[in-house]
């Protein structure tokens, strides 16, 4: 049996964490809710792919912390594939 590829989901919204975990059930999913946890998980698990929400605590309405996380990930593991996502600018109905 082959090992599942590892996916690190960096998302502070618990509902979205659950949805993404469900959507990627063919991956070994690791979840982090903030930049520090994401960097710890990156070092520990060495994921193949990272999905990164730009709106992370302490300012989930901004993008600065997400860009800091992106920079940290690229500096530590430059070959990691990263999918950047953000709800900023999304329309509410």
List where the protein language model places each region.
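Two-component/phosphorelay signaling modules centered on CheY-like receiver
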Residues: 2, 13-36, 44, 49
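Short amphipathic alpha-helix used as the core "switch/output" element in two-component signaling
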Residues: 40, 55, 60-79
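Negatively charged, flexible loop motifs adjacent to catalytic sites
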Residues: 88-93
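Redox-cofactor binding/interface segments in oxidoreductases and associated redox assembly factors
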Residues: 52
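Short, flexible coil/linker segments at domain boundaries that flank nucleotide/cofactor-interacting
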Residues: 1-3, 77
């Amino acid at each position: 049996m082959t090992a599942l590829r590892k996916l690190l989901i960096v998302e502070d919204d618990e509902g979205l964490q659950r949805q993404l975990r469900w959507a990627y059930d063919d991956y070994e999913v690791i979840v982090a809710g903030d930049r520090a946890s994401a960097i710890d998980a990156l070092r520990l698990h060495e994921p193949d792919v990272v999905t990164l929400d730009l709106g992370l605590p302490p300012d989930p309405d901004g993008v600065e912390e997400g860009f800091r996380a992106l920079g940290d990930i690229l500096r530590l593991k430059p070959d990691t594939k990263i999918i950047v996502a953000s709800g900023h600018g999304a329309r509410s109905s």
